[in-house]
A protein has these predicted regions:
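Macrodomain-like recognition of ADP-ribose-binding/processing modules
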Residues: 1-165
Length: 165
């Protein structure tokens, strides 16, 4: 069940937050930076994973913090070419594959609610009108609340009450 909300995704009560990055992302801009600042150990764990696994666009990486919060990184963007390079742009193909993987993960791990931004539209460079149908296709039939933070308002708790399962 998809629900569009307005607010600060970092204040979400959802069981997991999903966001788009590149496979070798530095988490130094956009939502990724905010997540890195809120959960520094997540970024350290991502760095370790990225060096061990060589992730590819279209995949996902999930992290669970000490307090039970989950962050799921969707590899929607091309990796940077060299060490220290900025991530490439997102593609609809990568977004689709990552959302499909996310959908399977949510079911397998029994995630009870999910929050995500307008995926791949900031740093990723895609238009929401093109990404939204993919979100609907891959997440619309999940039997959990899927909160899409369509408008960011810093420090504002979104009204998630209409999204109860």
């Amino acid at each position: 069940m998809l629900h569009e909300v307005t607010g600060d995704i970092l204040l979400s009560k959802a069981n997991a937050i999903a966001h788009g990055v590149s496979p070798n992302d530095h988490f130094n801009q956009g939502l990724a930076l905010s997540l890195r600042e809120q959960w520094p150990s997540m970024y350290k764990d991502f760095r370790h994973f990225e060096k061990q696994a060589t992730p590819a666009p279209g995949g996902i990486w999930a992290w669970m913090g000490y307090g039970g919060q989950r962050v799921i990184s969707l590899f929607t963007q091309e990796p940077g070419i060299g060490h220290g390079d900025h991530a490439g742009k997102a593609s609809l193909s990568h977004v689709g594959h990552a959302l499909k993987a996310l959908s399977h993960f949510v079911v397998e791990e029994r995630i009870s609610s999910l929050a995500l931004p307008r995926l791949a539209t900031g740093v990723g460079g895609l238009a929401w009108k093109d990404v939204h149908p993919l979100v609907t296709q891959h997440l619309g039939n999940l039997e959990i609340p899927v909160l899409i933070y369509t408008t960011y308002v810093k420090s504002k708790q979104a009204d998630e009450s209409t999204a109860s399962a």
